[in-house]
Amino acid sequence: MAKKIKQIAIYGKGGIGKSTTTSNISAALSVAGYKVMQFGCDPKSDSTNTLRGGEYIPTVLDTLRDKQIVRAHDVIFEGFNGIYCVEAGGPAPGVGCAGRGIITSVSLLKQQKVFEELDLDYVIYDVLGDVVCGGFAVPVREGIAEHVFTVTSADFMALYAANNLFKGIHKYSTEGGALLGGVIANSINAPYAKEIVDDFVARTHTQVMEYVPRSVSVTQAELQGKTTIEADPNSKQAQIYKSLAQKIVDHTESKVPVPLETSELREWASNWGKQLVELEAGVLSPAAAGNL
């Protein structure tokens, strides 16, 4: 009987730290002994950079444009600790759908049965989550990923993107689509930021997988073209990423989230905005102040 490969998708608004988080999860899983492939699904094609010393790799779409026949191994490159790296890529500027690269790339690797050949334990799709359009929704819509996680901060636009993803998951949940594993709360340093994310998670009926603080160790590692797991494996930040990776290993049951309507989300955000104004003015709201 063939080994079951655990396939997960990690979504997040551009600039939220999605690729940083994904690469550190991949690195942590690899260090723990799992065979991992990281599949970059962003037209910027930089998902796997910190797994390969800061180097870009040829994308699937670029390779298909250059060659008539493409073998899957033409687009798979080895990174830190044997992690397999793939970048879907995007169309030429101004032409076509950016999400098309995901559809084409997944089809290429599946047709050639690469996941089974490499005896993978995990395939992690790093997906742009600003817009869950046709191409970018593939891991959710087609049920390619078994579990979906989203990276967000306490910033409104990051939560807005997460809520949009929840709408997509909810829409496809009755058609065999992937379900939500939980939220990865990133750049959580202030007590009020944790309170905001916790409140959002409670209202959308999901869970926080891990709180990841902003850390200079991440910046230092990325300037070297490395993950924190590789550059500073004994740091507190590396331990947080390892904890997150273990929680993903242990995770078995994903659920359908309950997204907020746009008007509800706007009203909720406005109420939090008022609490933060009170906090800044010295009128300490227990929720906004983290019960300090």
From Swiss-Prot:
GO MF: 4 iron, 4 sulfur cluster binding; ATP binding; metal ion binding; nitrogenase activity
GO biological process, one term: nitrogen fixation
Chain positions with ADP-ribosylarginine modification: R100
Transmembrane region(s): none
Cofactor remark from the record: Binds 1 [4Fe-4S] cluster per dimer.
EC nos: 1.18.6.1
CDD domains registered for this protein in UniProt: NifH
Catalytic activity: N2 + 8 reduced [2Fe-2S]-[ferredoxin] + 16 ATP + 16 H2O = H2 + 8 oxidized [2Fe-2S]-[ferredoxin] + 2 NH4(+) + 16 ADP + 16 phosphate + 6 H(+)
Cofactor: [4Fe-4S] cluster
Keywords assigned by UniProt, alphabetized: 4Fe-4S, ADP-ribosylation, ATP-binding, Iron, Iron-sulfur, Metal-binding, Nitrogen fixation, Nucleotide-binding, Oxidoreductase
Keyword match DNA repair: no
Xref: InterPro entries: NifH/chlL_CS, NifH/frxC, Nitrogenase_Fe_NifH, P-loop_NTPase
Record text on subunit structure and interactions: Homodimer.
Similarity-based family: Belongs to the NifH/BchL/ChlL family.
Function: The key enzymatic reactions in nitrogen fixation are catalyzed by the nitrogenase complex, which has 2 components: the iron protein and the molybdenum-iron protein.
The name this protein goes by in its record: Nitrogenase iron protein 2
The organism of origin for this protein: Paenibacillus durus (Paenibacillus azotofixans)
